[in-house]
Regions:
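Catalytic machinery of carbohydrate-active enzymes
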Residues: 1-166
Length: 166
């Protein structure tokens, strides 16, 4: 959201699994969503090559890998070979391992996920201010948007858990 509002003249395409489309549909006018069914259509090397061709056809000027998993590593290699501007997230795994180590624990604050995402964007030439607080509450604490109707109403017997998948 911060990228979309701070750089309104760039076109942003989010690539993710189909379930995530609802999170990005009405986010900002310069944000679009592209589905990738990695369980079926893009589940192997042949599929990843097809996905790569589909992505190249979009003529992106920069690629931000916020996931950094085996599939995205492969796609990153392909984009790097073709000289696209590519940046990927640093998950700071070594620091996290030291933080939870049984011996010689090193208690150093690790960067937040938001900071890691912002670092990826900065590497691509789009530094963002991390002053975002909510899509649903303005800077004065007033509710600006009701939760989407797709969520429905919680009944007294249900337990809801909020998860941020990105």
């Amino acid at each position: 959201y911060s990228l979309a509002t701070q750089y309104p003249n760039i076109r942003i395409t989010v690539l993710s699994k189909p379930f995530a489309k609802a999170f990005f549909e009405d986010l900002a006018s310069n944000v679009s969503f592209m589905e990738a069914d990695i369980k079926k259509e893009y589940s192997n090397i042949k599929g990843l090559n097809a996905l790569y061709r589909r992505l190249v056809a979009k003529n992106f000027t920069a690629i931000a890998d916020f996931h950094s998993i085996l599939r995205s590593h492969y796609l990153r290699i392909r984009f790097n070979i073709d000289r696209y501007k590519v940046a990927h997230i640093n998950k700071h795994r070594a620091g996290k391992r030291r933080l939870i180590s049984n011996n010689n624990k090193v208690l150093i604050q690790q960067p937040t996920s938001f900071r890691n995402y912002a670092d990826v964007l900065a590497k691509l030439g789009y530094p963002v201010n991390l002053d975002f607080t909510s899509l649903f509450i303005d800077k004065y604490g007033r509710t600006t948007v009701q939760l989407p109707e797709a969520i429905g109403t919680k009944n007294s017997l249900q337990q809801w858990i909020g998860i941020a998948p990105f």
